[in-house]
Amino acid sequence: MEDKVFNKPIEKQFEFDEEVASVFDDMLNRSVPFYKENLNLQIDILKNFLSDQDKIIDLGSSTGTFLIELAKKKENLDLIGIDNSEAMIKRAKNKARAFGVKVEFINSDFLEYDLSGSKAIVANYTVQFIRPLKREKLIKKIYDSLKNDGIFLMSEKLITENKKLNKIMIDIYYDYKKQMGYSEFEIAQKREALENVLIPYTMQENIEMLKNAGFKEIEVVFRWNNFATFIAFK
């Protein structure tokens, strides 16, 4: 279905409910530059570090795209997707069933869920929705939950310390969204809905947060404008 969530005035706080879940795949493909390409890049990198029965957990797994694609490319993995949206989990389960892949999707708060024993943990555009006071605690939990040779993949929207550059990058992103078919009204509505809900960090703040949690090797494997993907090794 086509994303039309923000083509009408906002009447409630943004949440990942049934209305959003029903169009979320289209929303991601049109709102996140190079979304499919980035996910495929992460999978192609990650599969080289994985062995049979390794546990991989996707935090904020939404409709399950990442784990389903990983399952199609590499078999015999213990794949778990966690999301606190029941509507997202329902769609993820239906998609996994349709593709005939084995992935466990759990409706839970990953801040409370036991992540221990994971070879890899993935969070694509998820951490940015965690309140800053809880964010460092989550990253430390991820580090502690990984095996000694574990990997954390994190994609985030970014801000820059230079205010003029930040405005330029935001304008470039809004131009991209217009090219993808969103109206200025829809863009403005979504910006208002996500204000104080999605709280991005700078590149350096994200790297420092990963270092403070204990990660020693951190690389940026993808970047477009104000979007980036980090890989961190325990």
UniProtKB/Swiss-Prot annotation:
Gene3D superfamilies under this entry? Vaccinia Virus protein VP39 (3.40.50.150)
Q: Which reaction does it catalyse?
A: prephenate + S-adenosyl-L-methionine = carboxy-S-adenosyl-L-methionine + 3-phenylpyruvate + H2O
What's the EC number here? 2.1.3.-
Keywords, A to Z, come to: S-adenosyl-L-methionine, Transferase
PANTHER family according to UniProt: CARBOXY-S-ADENOSYL-L-METHIONINE SYNTHASE, TRANS-ACONITATE 2-METHYLTRANSFERASE-RELATED
The UniProt entry, under HAMAP family, shows: Cx_SAM_synthase
Protein name stated in the entry: Carboxy-S-adenosyl-L-methionine synthase
Q: Which gene encodes it?
A: cmoA
